[in-house]
Amino acid sequence: MASGILSQSTWVHAEDSAELAKQALNPVAAMYSLPVQYNWDQKMGPSGGGMRSLTNIQPVLPFTLNDDWNLISRTILPVIDQHGLAPGGAADKSGVGDVTQSFFFSPKKPTDSGWILGAGPAILIPTGSDDLLSSEQWALGPTVVALKQSNGWTRGILANHLWGLDDSPPDEKDKVNSTFLQPFLSFTNSQFTTYGINTESTYNWQSREWSIPINLMVTQLLKIKGQPLTVQAGPRYWIESPDDGPQGWGFRVAVTFLFPR
């Protein structure tokens, strides 16, 4: 399969490819992109026999505000398929989860020390197609990103905090009160292959529990029939999770379509 893909594609060697590779790793790059990310996790539920497939559709839309500032819209639409989380298949569901919508106001130029910054609001929208796939409440809070890119290295952090707006959510759901932290580090070589590590840690202030997967990813920048894109794959390991959450190893594969301006 891999040889078939490579036979229809060429490694990207244009002079602007290094910049394109950097932009693909920048959450607030002024570039249209469409990441589609598939995650598989296991050992969920009271018996540890449950599994979940999570496909995140994550369009990124940049808007120019003036000569100095951009507004970057980042949307995460989760499509969920879960099985075996409860006896008798009571929690077996497939459908859409809640959308997370973030807006980053970002200076067009890095700081004097080379840091790229962005900040703005994050909104949780209760779009879940089933009450088992949704928090059933709106939530709002701040989101920030800071990163630095030099000599092939990209390092930084993306974070947000969401507070539920409903003091009494339906179906006895806990009020949303969670912090998300995503520190990341990667290196891109001369063939525009990126080796990266990150965590996507969430702390639930209501239950006082962490969810912490470590992701190890390899990403390749390609052009297929003139369309620049990245393909990504790698394992993930849950070092901390609620009792009914995923345990042990999982994996991620992703493709991101890039549309340079």
For each feature predicted by the language model, list its residue ranges:
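N-terminal signal peptide c-region/cleavage motif recognized by signal peptidases
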Residues: S7-S9
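Transmembrane beta-barrel domains of Gram-negative outer membranes and organellar outer membranes
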Residues: A14-R261
